């Protein structure tokens, strides 16, 4: 019997990804809103397959983001960091960021 996988995404993460669509479009990273939506949909698709992706332990100094993390290289220039907690087959996605954020220095420890 296959156990059910439950993936819960914190509201702060969904809000961030919703805003990301608008940001990518208005800052002209994408010429069409649909392309920005597709970009974010690909991130969601990656997250929903978290159970099949090798994850790493988060360094102690940033475990407030989550005890584990995975990385997703969506483009040549952008690496996404997805932080989460896990118990059995339940995953709580707590934080998402990328290497372009203003204070990305903490990501260098990963």
Predicted regions and their residues:
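An N-terminal domain-start capping segment
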Residues: 1-2, 46-49, 100
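Arg/Lys-rich, positively charged N-terminal/basic patches that mediate binding to nucleic acids
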Residues: 1-44
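Secondary-structure transition/capping residues
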Residues: 24, 31, 54-61, 104
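Short, surface-exposed, charged/polar-biased interaction segments
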Residues: 34-41, 45, 64, 71, ...
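A short, surface-exposed loop/turn module that caps and links secondary-structure elements
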Residues: 45-75
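Enriched for short, Lys/Arg-rich terminal
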Residues: 72-110
């Amino acid at each position: 019997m296959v156990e059910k996988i439950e993936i819960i995404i914190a509201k702060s993460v969904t809000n961030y990804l919703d805003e990301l669509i608008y940001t990518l479009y208005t800052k002209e990273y994408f010429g069409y809103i649909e392309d920005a939506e597709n970009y974010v949909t690909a991130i969601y698709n990656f997250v929903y397959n978290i159970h099949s992706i090798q994850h790493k332990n988060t360094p102690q100094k940033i475990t407030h983001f989550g005890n584990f993390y995975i990385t997703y290289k969506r483009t040549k220039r952008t690496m996404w960091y997805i932080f989460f907690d896990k118990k059995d087959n339940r995953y709580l996605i707590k934080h998402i960021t990328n290497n372009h954020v203003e204070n990305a220095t903490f990501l260098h420890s990963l």
